[in-house]
Amino acid sequence: MAVPFVEDWDLVQTLGEGAYGEVQLAVNRKTEEAVAVKIVDMTRAADCPENIKKEICINRMLSHTNIVRFYGHRREGNIQYLFLEYCRGGELFDRIEPDVGMPEQDAQKFFQQLIAGVEYLHSIGITHRDIKPENLLLDERDQLKISDFGLATVFRHNGKERLLNKMCGTLPYVAPELIKSRAFHADPVDVWSCGIVLTAMLAGELPWDQPNEVCQEYCDWKEKNHYLTPWKKISATPLALLCKMLTENPQSRITIPDIKKDRWFTEIIKKGLKRSRVISGGSSDSSVLCKQIRSDIDISHFSHSEEKTALSSTQPEPRTALATWDSNSSYIDNLVQGKGISFSQPACPDNMLLNSQLIGTPGSSQNVWQRLVKRMTRFFTKVNAESSYSNLMDTCEKMGYVLKKSCANEVTLSTTDRRNNKLIFKVNLVEMEDRILLDFRLSKGDGLEFKRHFLKIKKKMDAVVAVQKVLPDT
């Protein structure tokens, strides 16, 4: 059964882990409303209390359709609880096909929503400083939501702007001035990161490891070698916008008002449109040039600031979907302000999903699916639970993964990706009536690398994979 949290609320599923704690899905037994609960252990690090206090203050300032909604917080002893929207659509990276990207029409839609959210943040003097696909969530209507304000800061107050000097973010997404300069303006840094996200959506890969002279791919970009990957996969109109967004000099970089006037940003792209451009120039070895998206690169050794370098070194906790209830409802008040939190945490809350009291109709698998985060990394098997489990373990062991049985029906897989970065993901075996579901969830590392590994495992297990489509639609 689900674990009681506050009166009428149960913790039913783990959504993600982070450096200081985890995010759980809380569901109201009476209304079936869902909220993401970020549970932070304040004793994990000396700077944790101050960082969480800052994150809460910034979240309180935010109110925009493209920003994950913050409902409130409460503290019990050394545990801090943050209550946020539950975004059932999952993370943006899950919509990006490795080395391919996504349809240009979809990329444009998500990019427009991203720019709307970033424009709002800048209008109230806040910079995010860690924009990447893993921090961009989707609700049930595919509305993009910017999440994770752990590295965000205020750069303008009462009309007075300050320069930033803190080296933070995720290396492939950071602007070059963060590496080169001791002080820099906030706005252009977020614009640069948005450009890298757009590149990932259109090409399914990142352009470089880091934006400096030691990276050949970045030097090629500055030399305008657009016949190389990933640029050769991007049509001329969006590439022209990227050239303006990924301009090395921040003073020459395009601003958000001008992005909104750009031809590609404003044009109506027909569904299914496939465009190509004539490419001239030399050839390249794509296996050498391919730069996968990853989010766990340590950039501390680049810091030249007196401020402590802030790293985004783990898979961000998924927050997340636009709530339909009144934010002043007694149910939310009870969750945020109520008494009697149960501190008995389940050993493996993911496995309690099917037995939770949140299910409105006993035995209804559809209600279960309505509470699952939308992901493409899951499949049904056509064998029983025991055979599914043994097949998974045998396959992953042969493929060289480090296996750890976390608890009943959950396995943690660890490996290194093609760039020698740590990759950890969990596999839950879920029994649904006469069906067995293998649900893969990224815990730490790069989203696209995780998807590559999932596809390889699925292919190896092809003999037991069912052709039945997994709900909800992906």
UniProtKB/Swiss-Prot annotation:
Impact after mutating S344E: Impairs autoinhibition by the AIR domain
Outcome reported for the amino acid change (mutating T314D): Impairs autoinhibition by the AIR domain
Reported impact of S365A: Abrogates phosphorylation and activation during checkpoint signaling
PROSITE patterns: PROTEIN_KINASE_ATP, PROTEIN_KINASE_DOM, PROTEIN_KINASE_ST
Catalyses which reaction(s): L-seryl-[protein] + ATP = O-phospho-L-seryl-[protein] + ADP + H(+); L-threonyl-[protein] + ATP = O-phospho-L-threonyl-[protein] + ADP + H(+)
Modified sites of kind Phosphothreonine: T314
Subcellular location: Nucleus; Chromosome; Cytoplasm; Cytoplasm, Cytoskeleton, Microtubule organizing center, Centrosome
Activity regulation annotation text: Activated through phosphorylation by atr or atm in response to DNA damage or inhibition of DNA replication.
Impact upon substituting S356A: Abrogates phosphorylation and activation during checkpoint signaling
Entry keyword set: ATP-binding, Cell cycle, Chromosome, Cytoplasm, Cytoskeleton, Developmental protein, DNA damage, Kinase, Nucleotide-binding, Nucleus, Phosphoprotein, Serine/threonine-protein kinase, Transferase
Gene Ontology CC: one annotated term: cytoplasm
Residues bearing PTM Phosphoserine: S344, S356, S365
Protein origin, superkingdom: Eukaryota
GO molecular function: ATP binding; histone H3T11 kinase activity; protein serine kinase activity; protein serine/threonine kinase activity
Binding residues for ATP: L15, G16, E17, G18, A19, Y20, G21, E22, V23, K38
Residue span of region Required for nuclear localization: 367-474
InterPro entries to which the protein is assigned, alphabetical: Chk1_catalytic_dom (IPR034670), Kinase-like_dom_sf (IPR011009), Prot_kinase_dom (IPR000719), Protein_kinase_ATP_BS (IPR017441), Ser/Thr_kinase_AS (IPR008271)
Domain Protein kinase, chain residue ranges per copy: 9-265
PTM per Swiss-Prot/TrEMBL: Phosphorylated by atm in response to ionizing irradiation. Phosphorylated by atr at Thr-314, Ser-344, Ser-356 and Ser-365 in response to various stimuli that cause checkpoint activation, such as hydrogen peroxide-induced oxidative stress. Phosphorylation impairs binding of the C-terminal autoinhibitory region (AIR) to the kinase domain and thereby enhances kinase activity.
Any one Gene Ontology BP term: chromatin remodeling
Pfam families noted in UniProt: Pkinase
Family membership: Belongs to the protein kinase superfamily. CAMK Ser/Thr protein kinase family. NIM1 subfamily.
Cited function: Serine/threonine-protein kinase which is required for checkpoint-mediated cell cycle arrest and activation of DNA repair in response to the presence of DNA damage or unreplicated DNA. May also negatively regulate cell cycle progression during unperturbed cell cycles. This regulation is achieved by a number of mechanisms that together help to preserve the integrity of the genome. Recognizes the substrate consensus sequence [R-X-X-S/T]. Phosphorylates wee1 at 'Ser-549' and cdc25c at 'Ser-287', which creates binding sites for 14-3-3 proteins which activate wee1 and inhibit cdc25c.
Domain notes: The autoinhibitory region (AIR) binds to the kinase domain and inhibits its activity.
Protein name: Serine/threonine-protein kinase Chk1
Taxonomy of the source species: Eukaryota, Metazoa, Chordata, Craniata, Vertebrata
Primary gene name: chek1
